[in-house]
From Swiss-Prot:
This is Serine hydroxymethyltransferase 1, mitochondrial. The keyword Transferase applies. Keywords: Mitochondrion, One-carbon metabolism, Pyridoxal phosphate, Transferase, Transit peptide. The keyword Mitochondrion applies. One of its GO terms (cellular component) is mitochondrion. Its cofactor is pyridoxal 5'-phosphate. The modification N6-(pyridoxal phosphate)lysine is found at K287. One of its GO terms (molecular function) is glycine hydroxymethyltransferase activity. Pathway: One-carbon metabolism; tetrahydrofolate interconversion. Belongs to the SHMT family. The lineage of its organism: Eukaryota, Viridiplantae, Streptophyta, Embryophyta, Tracheophyta. It catalyses: (6R)-5,10-methylene-5,6,7,8-tetrahydrofolate + glycine + H2O = (6S)-5,6,7,8-tetrahydrofolate + L-serine.
């Protein structure tokens, strides 16, 4: 009861002044580390405070060195994995702050630990900013910012709103869906979602690469799902949310929109929003949103309808979802992540952020156009969001082999299934996206160059395949080790690195890097 009362107080507490939290300074600063004066009262034999306040390079040079290597990789490479991004320095400062020290099971105003005054302020501010970022009325929408990542967030929703073995429909994984929506093969339930719930996929029309909404509606009529997921991890087109809403209404099913990949684009208003149609919306917070690694669950609240008897019916999602997150499936929230998310959500309402997301879209369109002109087949023929899915079958090579060559030349992309694949172990495609490199300042002409590098890598992969003594990936990797091939890889890697190094790093300064060569 106390938890429910506290949750109802969130909207009013969100309006309280927050000056005490910031106190005119920074949430986190290396210069705020204690000086030697702090240790004037140290007790005999109590030596650990000095160690606890020593910098990373002193305490653990091995980990410090690994971090420096990762900085160099990010600086010298081309990051094309669409689920990745470079989060801001300010977000990383918040995530690396003292907010990591506090346990706070429960919700603002209803914690199971004391000392959470400022944790409550940060979480309440994060919730307020989440609603503002997506232009939502707090009387009609609520949000939980405690989920640790996207897959748990989806499972929280299923646990809250469904009974065991209720039915879920979602986009098939080989057609661009996600494991957290439930996936099983003919012989095995791969995702835990498919163990605890009954799942049925809808698919793309393989001739067009678009979702087959007609077949989805027919399947839903037969399957009678309790929940339908509108969301994907490798679908380059916009969802027809209105069409899925219509199917949900017909089946009296809950509509869950998983906007994990596209939430940054939605926040900036450069693509249609699912909030006009969905009952519940989930998202991760790192991908196009460019925050820390976490997740959010948005849910409708307030008046749902007036029934035939003239009685008002209200949404009952809020308490169910909050209780599924805690205490149902999680304990203490990650307060440092929530604090960093609050910073990212503030950034998401700026003019710079909107301009960034517009550039993400322009870059994706240019990338797709250049790839098509270079003879590549794209699933659905193009893109309407931040990613492209390349079908490599007309090149006579699979995604696993191309991914190996791309990685060797410092281009990060991922192999991906495409319609018509018979094995997830030998996927026919490569998935690539524009958010990360756009964060570094890449524009259209740069993505034309990236497409050129990709084309060279694919041609090299085809050559290596021709020289391999077998058809398996291990045979391909062995063929990559020849001196002639290594020479070609080295040249392409050099060209990629020299191009990438021209652009700004995000979250750290080039001048402070240990490995610059």
């Amino acid at each position: 009861m106390a938890m429910a009362l506290a949750l109802r107080r969130l909207s009013s507490s969100a309006d309280k002044p927050l000056q005490r939290l910031f106190n005119g300074g920074h949430l986190y600063s290396m210069s705020s580390l204690p000086s030697e004066a702090v240790y004037e009262k140290e007790r005999p034999g109590v030596t650990w405070p000095k160690q606890l306040n020593a910098p990373l390079e002193v305490v653990d040079p091995e980990i410090a060195d690994i971090i420096e290597l990762e900085k160099a990789r990010q600086w010298k490479g081309l990051e094309l994995i669409p689920s990745e991004n470079f989060t801001s320095l300010s977000v990383m400062q918040a995530v690396g702050s003292v907010m990591t020290n506090k346990y706070s099971e429960g919700y603002p105003g209803a914690r199971y630990y004391g000392g959470n005054e400022y944790i409550d302020m940060a979480e309440t501010l994060c919730q307020k900013r989440a609603l503002e970022a997506f232009r939502l009325d707090p009387a009609k929408w609520g949000v939980n910012v405690q989920p640790l990542s996207g897959s748990p967030a989806n499972f929280h929703v299923y646990t809250a709103l469904l009974k065991a073995h209720d039915r879920i429909m979602a986009l098939d994984l080989p057609h661009g869906g996600h494991l957290s929506h439930g996936y099983q093969t003919d012989t095995k339930k791969i995702s835990a979602v498919s163990i605890f719930f009954e799942t049925m996929p809808y698919r793309l029309n393989e001739s067009t690469g678009y979702i087959d909404y007609d077949q989805l509606e027919k399947s839903a009529t037969l399957f009678r799902p309790k929940l339908i997921v509108a969301g994907a991890s490798a679908y380059a087109r916009l969802y027809d949310y209105a069409r899925i809403r219509k199917v949900c209404d017909k089946q009296k099913a809950i509509m869950l929109a998983d906007m994990a990949h596209i939430s940054g684009l939605v926040a900036a208003g450069v693509i249609p929003s699912p909030f006009d149609y969905a009952d519940v919306v989930t998202t991760t917070t790192h991908k196009s949103l460019r925050g820390p690694r976490g997740a959010m669950i948005f849910f409708r609240k307030g008046l749902k309808e007036v029934n035939k008897q003239g009685k008002e019916v209200f949404y009952d999602y809020e308490d169910k979802i909050n209780q599924a997150v805690f205490p149902g499936l999680q304990g203490g929230p990650h307060n440092h992540t929530i604090t960093g998310l609050a910073v990212a959500l503030k950034q998401a309402t700026t003019a710079e952020y909107k301009a960034y997301q517009e550039q993400v879209m322009s870059n994706s369109a240019k990338f797709a156009e250049t790839l098509v002109k270079s003879g590549y087949e794209l699933v659905s023929g193009g893109t309407e969001n931040h990613l492209v899915l390349v079908n490599l079958k007309n090149k006579g090579i699979d995604g696993s082999k191309v991914e190996k060559v791309l990685e060797a030349v410092h281009i990060a992309a991922n192999k991906n299934t495409v319609p018509g694949d018979v094995s997830a172990m030998v996927p026919g495609g490569i998935r690539m996206g524009t958010p990360a490199l756009t964060s570094r300042g890449f524009v259209e002409e740069d993505f034309a160059k990236v497409a050129y590098f990709f084309d060279l890598a694919v041609k090299l992969a085809v050559k290596i395949k021709g020289e391999a003594k077998g058809t398996k990936l291990k045979d391909f990797v062995t063929a990559m080790e020849s001196s002639a091939i290594q020479s070609e890889i080295s040249k392409l890697r050099h060209d990629v690195e020299e191009y990438a190094k021209q652009f700004p790093t995000i979250g750290f300064e080039k001048e402070t890097m240990k490995y610059k060569n």
